[in-house]
Amino acid sequence: MGTPYYKRVLLKLSGEALAGDQGYGIDPLTITTIAAEIKEVVASGAQLALVIGGGNIFRGLAASSKGMDRASADYMGMLATMINSLAMQDALEKIGVDTRVQSAIAMQEVAEPYIRRRAMRHLEKGRVVIFGAGTGNPYFTTDTAASLRAMEIGADVILKGTKVDGVYSADPKKDPTAQKYPRLTYLEVLKKGLQVMDATATSLCMDNNLPIIVFDITTYGNIKKVVCGEEIGTVVKGE
């Protein structure tokens, strides 16, 4: 692998990215493949932090729309992200990558509490840091948690790994005329209501001028390509 273009990155994965083709739960082959690629990125000298969603286990928003109390549903979603975080930690440590999970909700038996300075020390020592339990507050998505943590640790970029190879004008699986955007501004994303991140997360990135790159995580080698500065997917940045 070449020299990393970005020295410190925050990789945001949806929970569904861990589910593979089965669509729910955690697919061992998928998580092992992602872990192997992360190992190569860290070996190149890049510092990598992770935020993983929980949608493969529980979707708080969907549950609240069916009548469940929104705060309770969101807390359940945060616990789902912790299950994914611990699974990813296990997959990484099995292949020799030092990994720490930091939780925004206290659960000292399984994870460190989130402490910004400690997280940054781990990264400086070449460890992968996984931020679990979102922001620790209901009504905030894991996208917003990813934006917040990226700012706090001084990341150069947020890499959002999805199942499509960028941002489209419509769902490419449903609409064959959907156009892929190679580049977008934050305002274009917000005005067009594009599914990059939710509005809160996008606004946070815009206010702090943090670029977002949306790319296809299902193709092996793409994380390395993005970290090395290769132009794949869609780049979202200021004017």
From Swiss-Prot:
It is found in: Cytoplasm. It catalyses: UMP + ATP = UDP + ADP. The keyword Aminoacyl-tRNA synthetase does not apply. GO terms for biological process: 'de novo' CTP biosynthetic process; UDP biosynthetic process. ATP binds at K12, L13, S14, G15, G55, R59, T162, Y168, D171. Its main location: cytoplasm. It comes from the Bacteria. It is an enzyme of class 2 (transferase). GO terms for cellular component: cytosol. This is Uridylate kinase.
